[in-house]
């Protein structure tokens, strides 16, 4: 009889991190996916034959809804009797680890893909640190996505438990066959290129924490120095972390900035292939997948000196690292990327190989499967 594993996420969108490895997981374990209702959970059930459990969870602090979600999780874990609950994302981590501890689930794993509290202030920061500490206390195993996240958990006193980074970090890995300059991708990319125009690309949520305010100001200044354009790909999240009104006006009025919206599949790859440099001035990350994807597509990157980004990018080898929240440093790095063709081409030439050697998807997934085998043998 196969051991039952429940993989838990706050929202179904986050399941993208695990669906690619479901076939291998299902060979060894009975896998149940748990999240708030959403189309990604529906798709996983249809495509992979996996069973889904739908429990609404709020991403923001909401005491009443959180208590209701916790009670539903307790009932679910009593009914399912899993050998392991493995949670990702902050709210699912807190609620699932508490519920799994209360119901005596033998193996309770939480993966920290990023930490919110280091960039928070005041009471909110104290609350976030407290909830992360509870998550760790209730878990039997704490998995930081990268060395930087692990260092923060230790240095801020969130937990004293032994922690382990799997492989070189990251939870998903990069499908190097998919993220490649295939003929059909390059055909689409050719239509997106503009002759004589240097193209910067950002892929991610268009929110304050991603450094969009600094990026807009840097780009507004840069457009007066060189023929450049910035393509912004990703959704706005005005209800959670809106960009400034000034930035919205810059995006609307500056002809050098083009908001593209959401792009997926080969269409997204075409934008990577049409760009000259990836720029990602985020304030905080766990291990940003888009920086790895850009590298796999042969792009040099400009990133900030934060967790994850500085583990993917090696200064001067496959990109440039600058201080976060510094629009002047961002402007100078972008201008240097435009002007110094020799350095840019050197970094572009190294980018794909440096991703493949550390973050190839099969390797990353094997690290997680080996970890599951190890801990379930010991505890079940």
Each model region followed by its residue ranges:
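A conserved mid-protein helix/loop that constitutes part of the nucleotide-sugar donor-binding site
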Residues: 15-20, 198, 202-221, 328-329
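Short, structured helix-loop element that forms part of the nucleotide-activated donor/catalytic region
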Residues: 42-45, 229-256, 260, 343
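Donor nucleotide-sugar binding/catalytic pocket of nucleotide-sugar-dependent glycosyltransferases
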Residues: 53, 133, 137-185
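Short alpha-helical donor nucleotide-sugar binding micro-motif in glycosyltransferases
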Residues: 77, 262-263, 270-275
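Aromatic "clamp/platform" in nucleotide-sugar-dependent glycosyltransferases that forms part
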Residues: 264, 283
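Short hydrophobic beta-strand element within catalytic cores of glycosyltransferases
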Residues: 291, 300-303
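Conserved acidic donor-binding segment of nucleotide-sugar-dependent glycosyltransferases
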Residues: 315-316, 320-327, 336-342
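A short, well-ordered alpha-helix in the C-terminal region of glycosyltransferases
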Residues: 329, 336, 343-358, 364-370
